[in-house]
Amino acid sequence: MSTATFVEIILAIILPPLGVFLKFGCKVEFWICLILTLFGYLPGILYALYIITK
């Protein structure tokens, strides 16, 4: 695991859309994560961790 991935994982736990944004930009992954985070914090975290570590 690289340092960048570690930082993205930490950011995904603190603020899920930010971690996804740093990895993918404003693509569909970011918007899905943002919507899931608005529906509930836990779904946003789970999706962000899944998509970053995939």
UniProtKB/Swiss-Prot annotation:
UniProt subcellular location: Membrane
Question: What drives induction of this protein's expression?
Answer: By low temperature. Also promoted by abscisic acid (ABA) and dehydration but is not a general response to stress conditions.
* One Pfam family linked to the record: Pmp3
Example GO BP: response to cold
Enumerate the UniProt keywords alphabetically: Membrane, Transmembrane, Transmembrane helix
Q: What stretches pass through the bilayer?
A: 2-22, 32-52
* Coiled-coil stretches noted in the UniProt entry, renumbered to this chain: none
UniProt topology in membrane:
Multi-pass membrane protein
GO terms under cellular component: membrane
State the similarity comment.
Belongs to the UPF0057 (PMP3) family.
Q: Report what the protein is called.
A: Hydrophobic protein RCI2B
Gene (UniProt): RCI2B
